[in-house]
Amino acid sequence: MIRKATVMKVYKDKYDDYKQRHDKLWPEMAEMLKAHGVHHYSIFLLEETGQLFAYLLVEDEDSFSEVAKTEICQKWWAYMAPLMETNDDLSPVSHDLKEVFYLA
């Protein structure tokens, strides 16, 4: 498995909405992620800044790179766009993190 981590940003007045939408993650979104080899996906919030830290395991980069091309992912991005910083295609503005330590 490949460990991935990224940071994003949710607007400070949208924390509750962000959590509620993820608490009710669309079943087809969860199914698509699993079908593309995504496991143990967690998102954490730093409330002081709105920074989100996402951590997930993926089976392989090629399969994971296909996630963004799916119709359901693009619908999810549009659904979440009012709550967070996004790019022109409505994908979240995100920055991949470089792993500097791991203890198995």
From Swiss-Prot:
List of catalytic residues: 22 (proton donor)
InterPro entries cross-referenced by the UniProt entry: Dimeric_a/b-barrel, L-rhamnose_mutarotase, Rham/fucose_mutarotase
Main location: cytoplasm
GO MF term (any one): L-rhamnose mutarotase activity
GO biological process annotation, one example: rhamnose catabolic process
Assembly description: Homodimer.
Entry's family note: Belongs to the rhamnose mutarotase family.
Protein name: L-rhamnose mutarotase
Species for this entry: Shouchella clausii (strain KSM-K16) (Alkalihalobacillus clausii)
Lineage: Bacteria, Bacillati, Bacillota, Bacilli, Bacillales
